[in-house]
Amino acid sequence: MIYISPKLVVALPVKELKDLNRIELLINDVDLVELRLDYLSKFDVDILDLFSKYKEKLIITLRDKDEGGVNYIDPAFKANFVRRMEREKFMYDIEARFALRYQVNVKDKIVSIHYFDNLPEFTEVKEIFDKFDEAYLRKIAVIAKRGYRELLMRVLDNYDNAVVMPMGVNGVERIAFSLLGSKLIYAHAGEETAKGQLHYKDVRRILNQLSTIMSSPST
């Protein structure tokens, strides 16, 4: 196995504006902070001004409810919000289905698909992913049903910019997939935003230990 160092992302559920104060506490501990704005019951586009100074280390996510989001977000508002983020050069994570329907820009952004109930065939994943060659990363999260490991490994074998995540499994599996080529590993800072996330401090410690082992001279 070739050891590949993924970027560590801490997912931060933003339920109140005061939760944004945690950004400054986290950005020096991890590579990126994901702001899950769909946890807010209401906000407007000007919320971007509150954390624009951190944009180089942020991923902004407004997840649709049918793809794992918490609160309903009006699609027209979301499309406008995403275009504002594009203009202001924020990194964002957008669902493939939404990106196609509303023709939002995905160049150098993260495009994602989620399967909570069924495991897709690889051909279905490929058909979707191949529409987003300009994306920075192509991400897939799947329920841990029979065959999910084989599916996710095939995605990694076919896409150099893939992020793969099994849901509802031991968090160590997420680390394993990141070592096999998944570009990001998501963790939490006290509250999971997806089943199977480990605390970011545990992930960081494990990755550091593996890095030390792999960089040590063979005996």
Curated annotation (Swiss-Prot):
Endpoints of the signal sequence: none
Similarity comment: family membership: Belongs to the type-I 3-dehydroquinase family.
PANTHER family named among the record's database cross-references: 3-DEHYDROQUINATE DEHYDRATASE
Name of this chain's protein: 3-dehydroquinate dehydratase
SUPFAM superfamilies linked: Aldolase (SSF51569)
UniProt EC number: 4.2.1.10
Cross-referenced Gene3D superfamilies: Aldolase class I
Protein origin, superkingdom: Archaea
Species of provenance: Sulfolobus acidocaldarius (strain ATCC 33909 / DSM 639 / JCM 8929 / NBRC 15157 / NCIMB 11770)
One GO-annotated biological process of the protein: aromatic amino acid family biosynthetic process
Record's keyword terms, sorted: Amino-acid biosynthesis, Aromatic amino acid biosynthesis, Lyase, Schiff base
Positions contributing to 3-dehydroquinate binding: 34-36, 63, 174, 193, 197
Positions annotated as active site in the UniProt record: 114 (proton donor/acceptor), 139 (schiff-base intermediate with substrate)
Enzyme class: lyase
GO molecular function: 3-dehydroquinate dehydratase activity
Pathway, per record: Metabolic intermediate biosynthesis; chorismate biosynthesis; chorismate from D-erythrose 4-phosphate and phosphoenolpyruvate: step 3/7
Subunit relationships: Homodimer.
Reactions catalysed, as given in the entry: 3-dehydroquinate = 3-dehydroshikimate + H2O
Function according to Swiss-Prot or TrEMBL: Involved in the third step of the chorismate pathway, which leads to the biosynthesis of aromatic amino acids. Catalyzes the cis-dehydration of 3-dehydroquinate (DHQ) and introduces the first double bond of the aromatic ring to yield 3-dehydroshikimate.
